[in-house]
UniProtKB/Swiss-Prot annotation:
A GO BP entry: translation
Subunit record text: Part of the 50S ribosomal subunit. Contacts protein L29, and trigger factor when it is bound to the ribosome.
GO function term, MF aspect, one: structural constituent of ribosome
Spans traversing the lipid bilayer: none
Assigned protein family: Belongs to the universal ribosomal protein uL23 family.
UniProt key word RNA-binding: yes
GO cellular component: a single term: ribosome
Pfam families named in the record: Ribosomal_L23
Gene3D superfamilies for this protein: 3.30.70.330
PANTHER family per record: 60S RIBOSOMAL PROTEIN L23A
Protein name: Large ribosomal subunit protein uL23
């Protein structure tokens, strides 16, 4: 685990990503999260295992390019994000949707 997130693992994970592709991946025990762009794979693994009490078997990360945004004549960039696809061990799961 890197020094940046020492003792602050809850700051690593921003939110789960719920898309059609991510929902299909739930069937094969893969969960997609938006994480801090400075987080390394060991940070993400430690945060997921500690927050959700599961065993992580693999992580794939991707850094999509920043998107430009305009507000009138002013141009800017959206915040940098990193996506992490987390594979869990057999028998583990994360409750993303409330039971109705």
């Amino acid at each position: 685990m890197t020094e940046r997130f020492q003792g602050r693992l809850a700051d690593v994970i921003r939110r789960p990503l719920i898309t059609e592709k991510a929902t299909r991946a739930l069937e094969i025990n893969q969960y997609t999260f938006e994480v801090d762009h400075r987080a390394a794979k060991p940070d993400i693994k430690a945060a997921i295992e500690q927050l959700f009490d599961v065993k992580v078997t693999g992580i794939s990360t991707m850094n999509p390019p920043r998107r430009s945004r305009r507000m009138g004549r002013f141009a800017g960039k959206r915040a940098q994000v990193k996506k992490a696809v987390v594979r869990l061990a057999e028998g583990n799961s994360i409750q993303l949707f409330p039971e109705s």
